[in-house]
Amino acid sequence: MTTVTPSAGRELSNPPSDGISNLRFSNNSDHLLVSSWDKRVRLYDVSTNSLKGEFLHGGAVLDCCFHDDFSGFSVGADYKVRRIVFNVGKEDILGTHDKAVRCVEYSYAAGQVITGSWDKTVKCWDPRGASGPERTQVGTYLQPERVYSMSLVGHRLVVATAGRHVNIYDLRNMSQPEQRRESSLKYQTRCVRCYPNGTGYALSSVEGRVAMEFFDLSEAAQAKKYAFKCHRKSEAGRDIVYPVNSIAFHPIYGTFATGGCDGFVNIWDGNNKKRLYQYSKYPTSISALSFSRDGQLLAVASSYTFEEGEKSQEPEAIFVRSVNEIEVKPKPKVYPNPAA
């Protein structure tokens, strides 16, 4: 494991003025979509460090995702699911939930928007229909508890809820979950992200741990699952444990970054169970992470997540760092030479 202290990365100008709930790179460019508790969704062009546009909503914006380079979807505390188009400054409401909407994903495979809410439902929407739920809503799927995090890979959807429940769906048949699971971690789930190769997912908790899980229920596949501790420190003989807020997979190598309330970003090689890198400490909690489509940039949201209640805090900031291959490329396993 290598620890160095490179710069935090380039800081974007015009950052949000309140907590950053998520940020995501486009699949086609260096555009970055950012949702925030200041009721705004912002689109940045990272290559020119410029704000391309923003929308003001009726409440805190809790998540956002891209549709294409200049449009996407946003959800939040005002219960609404919106399509937002930046190059023409237009938004429409696809529909609503009964409580705050925590998560949104767009499935390119299914052509649907998927939302997860604190009303204990997941809803699917067809954005090609005209505005309004009667024309765009595809289905509503009851969950055991409030939805905290979701992730997609291909036709698979993983939904993590309060109460440590995990439901795994096939988007082609949403009537029942393919699998109903319980988190293998003892404490509340903070983030779930699918492996880019589609074989499973990583799940993080408020108690400084990440679990590596596999979809295949065979004994051989399940024997590969494990969990590890991270984002902790020892102080005066006590272990101080921090929530792991964010997980982001590298699109080329399948290694992944975690961001915690300790202000650190770590890079992990999940297959070899090793930490590859730790970046120097950021000003405050890491609330969100995203790799660019080619894996050469990592966007880091440094934004206090109120794990210690009200206190004086560093201002919200978005850093974009260049990623060196040595930080994210798995190291080959070294086998001892057989005795002569």
Swiss-Prot record:
Ranges occupied by WD repeats: 15-54, 96-135, 142-179, 239-278, 281-324
Cellular component aspect of the GO annotation: Cul4-RING E3 ubiquitin ligase complex; kinetochore; kinetochore microtubule; nucleus; phragmoplast; spindle microtubule
Pfam family, one: WD40
Role noted for this protein: Has a dual function in spindle-assembly checkpoint signaling and in promoting the establishment of correct kinetochore-microtubule (K-MT) attachments. Promotes the formation of stable end-on bipolar attachments. Necessary for kinetochore localization of BUB1. The BUB1/BUB3 complex plays a role in the inhibition of anaphase-promoting complex or cyclosome (APC/C) when spindle-assembly checkpoint is activated and inhibits the ubiquitin ligase activity of APC/C by phosphorylating its activator CDC20. Essential for gametophyte development.
Region of interest called Disordered, as start-end residue ranges on this chain: 1-20
Record has Transcription regulation as a keyword: no
Main localization category: nucleus
Protein name, as recorded: Mitotic checkpoint protein BUB3.1
One Gene Ontology biological process: cell division
Organism: Arabidopsis thaliana
Compartments where located: Nucleus; Chromosome, Centromere, Kinetochore; Cytoplasm, Cytoskeleton, Phragmoplast; Cytoplasm, Cytoskeleton, Spindle
Disruption phenotype: Survives only in heterozygous state. Displays defects in development of male and female gametophytes.
Gene: BUB3.1
Protein keywords: Cell cycle, Cell division, Centromere, Chromosome, Chromosome partition, Cytoplasm, Cytoskeleton, Kinetochore, Meiosis, Mitosis, Nucleus, Repeat, WD repeat
Family: Belongs to the WD repeat BUB3 family.
Tissue expression profile of the protein: Expressed in actively dividing tissues, early in organ development, in young leaves, lateral root primordia and root meristems, flower buds, flowers and siliques.
Induction section of the entry: Cell cycle regulated expression with a distinct expression peak at the G2/M boundary.
UniProt superkingdom: Eukaryota
